[in-house]
Amino acid sequence: MIPWLAANDRFPPVERALEEPNGLLAAGADLSLARLIQAYESGIFPWYSEGQPLLWWSPDPRMVLFPSELKIQRSLKKRIGRRDFEVRADTSFEEVISACSEPRSGQEGTWITGDMVAAYAALAGAGHAHSIETWIGGELAGGLYGVALGRMFYGESMFTRAPDASKIALAHLVRQLERWDFGMIDCQMKTAHLARFGAREIARADFMRKLVNLVNYPRSTRKWRLDDDLFD
């Protein structure tokens, strides 16, 4: 059994999360700005589908990417070297999250519900959520979004409309975060795609120890601007 959270209830300790399904911790509450920030500070994220209650997760192990461990495959390096694109930050957050919410091939629905879109748009408006966007020929070709607290970044979702567009965005994000001394990127669940970039699983206890330090750095709420020389 998992607890059902009322509006003012705090999250239970992440150690109480279920083993199956891995990481399910609680249900209920809301997607208010304060609740989402509290969740991320606590190593918890929302994940649910249309028609389900609001579910909160903290899996063990946790997939993370340390910026200094970024791996870029040779083919992507060549693609980046062509410089026939522009990577921007925070110019089209709502377009990025809306694109991420579109059902993927082979999927019937999406976990990025209308309520989630509105909640993360509010986070972006408050300066805590950011989008990284790949533009080709003046069109948004791919990108990703996530949450930043202190020197911790939480990746949420990505999309692509052109070959390698989301990969280009991710590579630029990680290079920039390393330059800004961010310590860790939360990738939540294991995927082969992120593993190719150097992401790996660590124990939830290790994740939480690192998280506590990283989220306590000063928090900027300014819109991001990426450096122009990340791949010079």
Where are these regions (language model features)?
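N-acyltransferase acceptor-side catalytic subdomain
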Residues: 1-232
